[in-house]
Amino acid sequence: MIRIEKTDVYGWEAAIRGMRNPMNSWDKSDSYFETEYYNFRLDSVESVPCTHIGSDDLKLMMSLSKAGNDHGKFLRMINVTMDIIAPLYWWKEFDTYKVGTVANSCSTMHKIHAKEFVLGDFSWEKLDNQSIDVLEVVINRLNYCRNEFLATKDKKWWDQMIQLLPTSYEQKRTVQLNYQVLKSMYHARKNHKLQEWRDFCAWCETLPYFKEICGDEGGESDA
């Protein structure tokens, strides 16, 4: 299971400005990033931030994105931050994307003993009853080792937890990446055998203008 929360997308204005630098075509930009409204209480006109991508800018974005990474450098300037809670087996694959990503994670090494282990700490939704029984045996053993470590501070028990911990254990990370990285992930993973990757790619499609800019070209699956 994967959960994605607190998504923030920013950098559109700089990305569009930079995208138009090579042809000095700033005057053709039809996007705007603030709008005015009349404040009746203060009897004044005020501006508020907003993001509206114009049709001409969007058309150019789509064209440059299709032309490849060199022409689509503007995608690196559209930044995305979010919190992701996912099992360790998914993070192992996510970590193959080193360029253009930053992540701060909840530390397994430092905090593995901080709380009692429960079934909800793991991705188990596809397990049958027998496998759930096995996982619960592992959880009971993890909690025994945790209690022994808390009581004795003997590193032997900490080692037991670290080496016994299943890869279905869920970890939270706060992640920053950009549309170019997401585009690469999307086309490589959208048909992946892991449900977490398919859910991640479905989330990509909900990002502003992602389907138009990044989602309409072919991609090879590594499933």
Report the location of each language-model feature.
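Family-specific signature for flavin-dependent thymidylate synthase
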Residues: 1-223
